[in-house]
Amino acid sequence: MIWQNSARLKTIIASASTAAALLCAWSLSAPRVAVAQHFKPSAAPVTCATCHNGVATSYATAPMRHAMEPQGADPAMNAHPDLTAQIGGYTYTVKTRNGQSTYTVSDGTGALTLPIQWIFGQHSQTWVLEKDGHYYESLVSYFPRANGLAITPGDQKITPHNLTEAMGRRLPIWETRTCFNCHGSGVTPGEKLVPAKVTPGLDCERCHAGSRQHMADAVQENFKSLPKSLKRLDSEQISDFCGQCHRTWDTVMRNKWHGPAFVRFQPYRLEISKCFIGNDPRISCLACHNPHQPVNHTAISYDVKCLACHAGAKTASTPPNAKTCPVAKENCTSCHMPKVDLPGGHAQFTDHYIRVVHAGEPYPE
């Protein structure tokens, strides 16, 4: 997210293109003849969906595909055409009309209005605004839980002295690039960032480097070049891969971040769990989450994942790999991965630090 300054470090998978997430599955299991018949001169332009229609259709509704929305395409903005908040001495108004959204801040004597071109986030939303060639993170964001506007997390201590400062926090170049790179596709390392050329949301190439070349080769019936497959990564490498945007233990430690505000950094929290073993595929981001599908929020749906380790009585041939829970056999995450209120974020995040939770205990670092 763009809510905190950060250095995205970790180099275990430095050859991978930066991503927060894991997008389009790549498995050419069909015979070459069956695949090649897709690529006829009269056919529509080749896309990932040409061969991977099932995955592409599912991914169209996945959160990462909508990590950033262009104006006019965002359901939340269209469903809330008028948003207003009074914060300090400033009034904030967000209006959406005919697919166009504007962001206005006024102090009673003057006003500043800018178009909202980039909408970051699928649920809670922050906007990046452009003024005089510089980019700003909106000082207020939209929160469904609050059903309105509130201060953007991380910006609570900002005291604006004029309309421009009240509009939002000016982003340094590196942070602007990071924001667009983790919420969009097409940011080229080493080149000047041109937000207008960034594709909103994460496309297949973002996690499966080489997919564009693979499509170009497939048109020529050359199937030797394959895009990056995340199936070959172990649990620690997957955590680092996702953590390029969702943050890793290394990133948090280097920045000396502390407190419940960082519960939203799932790879970091998962890595400090006692049961996290870097080479065990049963506990990893992909073991519980299919990035090509919407997130399943029901606790019981994750029980089978937990029971992959914590199940069964000990026998001579199949000893259990971990202790079984003496309390319950279902809704494991409701006790061992509690939801934590994000300070100032008007939202709850599941704490991925897997542990035995004791009532009333302080937030564990």
Language-model segment annotations:
Residues 46, 54-120, 126-128, 152-164, ...:
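Primarily the internal scaffold of c-type cytochrome electron-transfer domains
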Residues 1-37, 151, 247-264, 281-283, ...:
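Post-cleavage N-terminal segment of exported redox proteins
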Residues 38-53:
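Local sequence-structure signature of Cys/Sec-based thiol-disulfide redox active-site neighborhoods
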Residues 130-139, 143-177, 185, 189:
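Extended acidic/polar, glycine-enriched regions
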Residues 37, 55, 169:
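Ordered, soluble secondary-structure elements with a strong preference for glycine-centered loop motifs
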